[in-house]
Amino acid sequence: MDIFIYSDESGVFDNIHNEIFVFGGLMFLSSKEMDDAMRLYAHAEQIVRKEEHLEDCCEAKASILSNKSKGKLFRSLNRFHKFGVVVTQRQLHKDIFAEKKSKQRYLDYAFKITVKRQFEKFIKEGKINKEESITLHFYVDEHTTATNGRYELKEALEQEFKIGTFNYNYQKYFPLIFKNLKKFI
């Protein structure tokens, strides 16, 4: 089984000037599902570009679109699997913001846990068979990679889903999700 994960982030991870930071994304449980979504979204985007008088070279960013156009784009993806997390920055420990790399480590953690919860939901609903051979395809838009942690994002995701993780502070093991994770792209 091929699972495709597309994600993007919005906001600035800076607790002094910003209140929230958001990750959002889509998961497709087959290449056909992904192709269908891309076709539907491309069609909706064409209509929005005409209505909003946007040039082809410009990205259709939410900050410049009308609510009607944003709604049209969102509705084009209604039947697909969406996920997201909102980070309320003032609730986080101030040490997270002390270094650029600690900030990135926290963002990687938030992303990893969000994706993990979505996989767990799909397994519980029977949409994913965790015993099946699985290839994960991650497409993370403009993601910074340097952290001050043990793993970069790719390694952290692979550790979480293929091997399992151990929290040394609490002496607790969190088991792997996919026994037969054959590829991680």
Segments the model singles out, each with a brief description of its role:
Residues 1-185:
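Phosphate-ester processing/binding pockets and catalytic centers
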